[in-house]
Amino acid sequence: MKKYDVIIIGTGAANIVLDAALKQGLQCAVIEKGKFGGTCLTRGCIPTKVLATAADYIREIQDLPKIGVEVEPAKMNWDIISRRVWEKIDEHKEVLRHYQKYANLAIYQGSGFFTGEKTLQVKLHDGSLSEEMTAEKIIIDVGARTNLPEISGREATGYICSETLFGDKYPKQPYKSLIIVGGGPIGCEFSHIFAAAGTKVTVVQHNNRLLSKADEDISEQIRQNMEAFGIKTYLNANLLEAKKADDQKTLLFEDRETGERIEVTGEEIMYATGIKPVSKELKIENTSIEMDERGWIKTNEFLETSVNGIWAIGDINGQPAFRHKANYEADILAHNLFGGNEPGKWRWARYDVVPAVTFTYPQVAQVGLTETEAREKGYAVKIGKQFYHNTAKGYALGFTSGDGMDGFVKLIVDGATNNILGVHVIGAQASLLIQPFINMLNMGTVTLKPINEEIGSETAQELRKLGLTRTLDPHSVISVGETMTPHPSLAEVIMWTQYYFEGK
């Protein structure tokens, strides 16, 4: 049995924790079945935004005549754009080389799984099994994968998803036509990317609106914008069958409202149908780690699982699946476990100020409650709404009333206190406009609120009894680092400056 101080499964946000442990001189092991760097770097938010940025410029150039600038029609050079995508993805090699330099780190490349309460093995890439290992501290950060729908003909027809698109199924040129199943953030972003590249895009969405977790006003506006760009959207769709004939793929679905059966055809089908946990691969059943009914690992406000000495961060714990949220959790663990801080100075996670940004055209950003959520919680809701075109800068940018690209900001306010409950933005640079509200909602004094109260080490239980509070001073640079910043956005430049003061 090999013994380590720390074992980390996954090399996404958990690298923040790993760095802190290595800095302490602890004997560490890291297990990674794929490319180093996690989903975000290798097949998620970063390569997607490289593509989305090119698509943004296509749309912006098309809008330039509104402000008196005439240009030749723009088009994507897919080869150059793709080279930039893969240059970024290939940084995973540098991440691996960086960690190979540490004498106090063992790297296992393969699929890790539990053999007992705190024992692990790895099925290495060559097919062999590693020696069993254990550690005082184990951190799970294994992400999630696409939740493929159960539909007749899916495998025989073939498909792509975010995992395979940035893998062996990356297209040499944009598809002539593409069916995207799913109208959440991933589906909407890829519809923007490929439509701007000249692809005929059809979106088939099970829900009755796009971006179903966004405010309803935002959902409707993004649907109208997508339709204006020639993206056909179908809502309330129950999938029935996928099939292939020659070089075309067909998707059959039923409209739940009308009962009508509809067929759509395209060169490729992409499933962007949410995510599911990978807990089965970890063989969690060999431990006492509690999961919810879907298989997400349950954690408390200190990221502890139901097994002492095992923590879980990132997508696998079932909280909002964003890299900035995972980074936030990793920072908390690094602070609590390896920052030399007594329990009384521990940080804890809160999930009421988790921002979300969707890089469609225009962008969508939100933090806090939607109008519907606020009313359901019993608040005396007041709404403030303002359009870009009503500002001088909005006019300068060419936005006009009734223009589908004209953005707006919507504030959800508690009428009894005038406290902001939620902020929703659709429009140019929404990812930047949302940041001041994230900061505002995160500042002040917050009392520890238990999450999954049945989970808790002795230390966690004692801290709960103390009724700990933590104050984030809006004047302190430390508060910048403890506030989530949407990833990837330019607002991260501001957030990263605080590392200078922490010596990172």
Indicate where each model-derived feature is located.
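A conserved FAD-binding loop/helix module that cradles the flavin
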Residues: 214-217, 221, 313-373, 432, ...
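Short hydrophobic core segments
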Residues: 7-9, 112, 120, 132-143, ...
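Glycine-rich dinucleotide-binding loop and its adjacent helix/turn
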Residues: 45, 142-200, 204, 232-233, ...
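FAD-site-proximal beta/loop scaffold in flavoenzymes
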Residues: 157-174, 263-343, 436-443, 449-453, ...
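Glycine-rich flavin
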Residues: 2-4, 19-26, 31-175, 207-211, ...
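Flexible, glycine-rich terminal cap/loop adjacent to redox cofactors
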Residues: 7-14, 19-34, 46, 50-57, ...
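A Rossmann-like FAD-binding core segment of flavoenzymes
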Residues: 72, 106-109, 113-126, 197-301, ...
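Beta1/beta-strand and adjacent pyrophosphate-binding region of the FAD-binding site
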Residues: 1-12, 174-184
